[in-house]
Amino acid sequence: MPHASAFLEVIPAIDLLQGRAVRLYQGDYAQAEQVAADPVQQAEIWATQGAPRLHVVDLDGAKSGDPVNLPIIADIVRKLAIPVQVGGGIRSLERARQLLDLGVERVIVGTVAVEDPALLEAMTQALPGRIWVGIDARQGQVATRGWLSTTPLAATELVQRVQAQGAAGIIYTDIGRDGTLAGPNLEQLRQILAVSRLPVIASGGIGSLTDLLALLSLPGLAGAILGKALYSGAISLPEALRAVGPGRWQDLPPETGSRWA
């Protein structure tokens, strides 16, 4: 039986909409709230605070089907020394290559995985290890096209399908929890982890260190993406890293750990 994760990769999110960094509530574009006027500057702040990686979503691209915020993404990648993963509107091999050529480490596809499995397989074969699948679900059912369309496909079924097609990993977002700070959907995550042989990163609803510690207890979970929790001040990135990241509090000898008190 798998053991609880030794640590989680804590990944700040930057969601791009019309050139700004925003947060949505349950995926609702009408409820977009600006969290930073300058996304590049915000990315640099997260990197300075110790982020091991950055998660960037092109919300305009997710709706339109074509990456819209490429100049901003290119600027973020150029100025950061940490790896950047990008999703939103990547529905062709050409677009995936374009992002990787900019220096993006991982490309995250969602709609393609549901609507064009053959294209997903072509992408994973052409770009091995670089294509991750974003599985976004409402009550366990997969949503696509920037969360604007819900399908009858079960998230667990899609996990099994994409790992057979060569995906490198999965980012699972519970749309009903997204932006709520109400806590992650642990039961759904357990179901995802039970069928996945791939690394899984959780997103949606994380609002406290207690939530992060609950995620840490899930066997096989690789990481957690934080958005609103960081921007609202509910969690600070340094304390999240100390709580569940590599070298977390529990891994320190008592005399060293006391320095963080």
Curated annotation (Swiss-Prot):
EC numbers, comma separated: 5.3.1.16
CDD domains linked: HisA (cd04732)
Compartments, record wording: Cytoplasm
Active site as annotated: 15 (proton acceptor), 136 (proton donor)
Gene3D superfamilies: Aldolase class I
Pathway as given in its UniProt record: Amino-acid biosynthesis; L-histidine biosynthesis; L-histidine from 5-phospho-alpha-D-ribose 1-diphosphate: step 4/9
InterPro entries given in the database record: Aldolase_TIM (IPR013785), His_biosynth (IPR006062), HisA_bact_arch (IPR006063), Isoase_HisA-like (IPR044524), Isoase_HisA-like_bact (IPR023016), RibuloseP-bd_barrel (IPR011060)
GO terms assigned for molecular function: 1-(5-phosphoribosyl)-5-[(5-phosphoribosylamino)methylideneamino]imidazole-4-carboxamide isomerase activity
Enzyme class: isomerase
Entry's Gene Ontology cellular component terms: cytoplasm
One GO biological process term: L-tryptophan biosynthetic process
Keywords for this protein: Amino-acid biosynthesis, Cytoplasm, Histidine biosynthesis, Isomerase
Reaction catalysed by this enzyme: 1-(5-phospho-beta-D-ribosyl)-5-[(5-phospho-beta-D-ribosylamino)methylideneamino]imidazole-4-carboxamide = 5-[(5-phospho-1-deoxy-D-ribulos-1-ylimino)methylamino]-1-(5-phospho-beta-D-ribosyl)imidazole-4-carboxamide
Transmembrane segments: none
PANTHER family: 1-(5-PHOSPHORIBOSYL)-5-[(5-PHOSPHORIBOSYLAMINO)METHYLIDENEAMINO] IMIDAZOLE-4-CARBOXAMIDE ISOMERASE
Family label: Belongs to the HisA/HisF family.
Protein name listed in UniProt: 1-(5-phosphoribosyl)-5-[(5-phosphoribosylamino)methylideneamino] imidazole-4-carboxamide isomerase
Provenance organism: Synechococcus sp. (strain JA-3-3Ab) (Cyanobacteria bacterium Yellowstone A-Prime)
